[in-house]
């Protein structure tokens, strides 16, 4: 994701010409600029918007963070063409790069909106892909979440900067409940990290198919293909976390989608939230045992 300096200006309830120009350069439309100007903190009669549930909202507030507004990024992307060899396991790097770049565009635009609000981070992020009717090779990549600002004393106090080492608002796909638990445990999110690999799985030879009829047998080329593809996605996600100087990644999800490529071409996508300890001597609180009286 592109490095960007903080553009939120304390006490200023309007977007400056410079801020508007920077957002436009990121691909944020004019309608979004007007909406963001109305959401800026300190504006008389201003409100916040959020896709958090009531429980999530209350727990995020309890953790010491104030919602500023719903932020989003979108990219409608034409995914190029690459054909795998019939009998060979291989990554389709043109498609891998397309899927990765499109998601990066959506995430960067969402981060730019949060930055314009002066947010410290974005919680409850959803990153989705929707295939469109414009064509089988056109998809919309959407990132949406709630921009938040840390209140004094958030995280137990003593934390002066909640942004990551790239000077961007942190991003997290954790639920409001998990975010509260993470902060209480003495950790902070750095950013969502991800890895993508589009992989072509070789077709079996006709003789092998015939020979396996009626047998319990491992299809080794399929096993190796799926193993390799997942490892590539995971290693790329881990590399992003290392670039953020993270201690670890929580809430990892490993997804598999064929999209419109057919049964032998699949995207393996790994995503999670990179985290860091808030202080070197942090202590994880012991969980409280709760016994229900329900029958």
Describe each PLM feature range:
Residues 2-95, 138-222, 273-295:
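Intrinsic disorder/low-complexity detector
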Residues 48-56, 105-106, 124-126, 170-177, ...:
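Short amphipathic alpha-helical surface micro-motifs
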Residues 71, 76, 85-126, 207-253:
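Short, well-ordered alpha-helical segments
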Residues 102-156:
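Hydrophobic, ordered structural segments
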Residues 121-133, 248-260, 282-291:
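Short, conserved loop-to-beta-strand elements that form functional interface hotspots
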Residues 217-220, 239-248, 252-283:
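C-terminal functional regions that serve as terminal interaction/effector modules
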